[in-house]
Amino acid sequence: MEAEYGTILLASGQPKTVEEGQKTMSKGRYIILAVLCGTVALAVGVIIGWFSKPSLTEEDRAALDKFRALVRGADETVGNTIMDEIDSERIRENLRELTKKPHMAGTAPDHEMAELIRQTWLDNGLDEARLVPYDFLLSYPPMGEMGPNNTAVTVDGTDFEFEDTRTAHIEPELQGDPDAPQFFYAFSPPGNPVGELVFANYGRPQDFEYLEKNASINCTGKIAIVKYGREGRGTKATNAAAVGAVGIIIYPDPADVNVPGGQVYPDGWFLPGTGVERGSTLSDPGEPLTPGYPATDYAYRKPLGDVDVFPPIPILPISYNDAQEYLLRLSGEEVPSGWNGSLPITYRLGPGFTDDWAAREVRINVYTNTTIQRVYNVIGMINGRVEPGRFQSMVSWRS
């Protein structure tokens, strides 16, 4: 007698025999049984783990109760209250107060500012505010009878034809303080190197390699002028010295610091043509004489002659207005396309000048002064209530 049905149709329409169908159902039962056993075993393990955990100590329970109380008592309006307390006019006045006169680190005005911040914090309700002194190796621009930091075009090493502006004439009534420091790069070695000018893009190793291999320019004895960015200031000087350059000038090209059509200060927030980028030439963090340790008065200090973190050649910043005066007169072939900036000139490699500046050279005058001076951190404290022995830090610069 034939069975009423002898095949099982799959979803694909392919037939199976009854035997094959029975085997498939048996295999499915085993899989279901295995899953059930695994689930039971997992549940048993969780139950055992839960009841075998150590009980909380009284100290743990007290701490947990504090945290639960904080959550229960959380005031969701606190964030809005903080935002409502922000006063743009007060921020404006604070900024005006903190910037109304020069206060280079290690000077008397710098100490006065530290004390002002300390007292302001106390007046605003901080539990504690104090000054913490450190004796730091600092670098300063020319002072007193020292010559000015500048670049100049020279004839036979003595006759200056052009000098850069050295000061930013943006708003004289705001920038006329006689104590305003000259433009300089901190920790540049002093010196007065003279040489032909050569444009080296960003002053990276590959830029100097291009000059040598693709443009056949030997940088030995040259002054390199480079754009700000892509490498650290001190690293640019090290790169230039490695190919024989005797000095380096850095300027901020508008292509790197501004945007097309953007308004410059004081009409906008972008850098004007007289603005100069300042900063340190050091790449290592911390104080050079006490690397890795705070520069306290009792700290061991390396002899200054043993410190090798300073640039090997003089390095000086100038504005892009002054840089344009040099670059528009450079001789030599045009730069590769990736080297162009956005000054209204044809960028050329050099070396040397054309036209009325032919046979002229460039002198860099750097008169930096390095000395140990006392500086201050301002430390403010708000005592915690839940975990007073732990610290949360908020840090910012003020000098």
Report each predicted region and the residues it spans.
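Soluble metallo-hydrolase cores and metallopeptidase-like ectodomains found primarily
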Residues: T24, G28, Q175-Y210, P285-S399
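Proteins synthesized as precursors that undergo proteolytic processing into mature forms
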Residues: I223-T235, A241
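N-terminal hydrophobic or amphipathic helices/low-complexity stretches enriched
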Residues: E4, S12-K16, K27-C37, A43-Q119, ...
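Short, solvent-exposed loop/turn and secondary-structure capping segments
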Residues: D110-H111, P141-P142, E209-E212, T235-N239, ...
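Short hydrophobic alpha-helical runs that function as membrane-insertion/retention elements
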Residues: A224-V226, V246-P252
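Noncatalytic luminal/extracellular "stalk/propeptide" segments of secretory-pathway proteins
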Residues: L64-T77, E93-I223, R230, P254-A255, ...
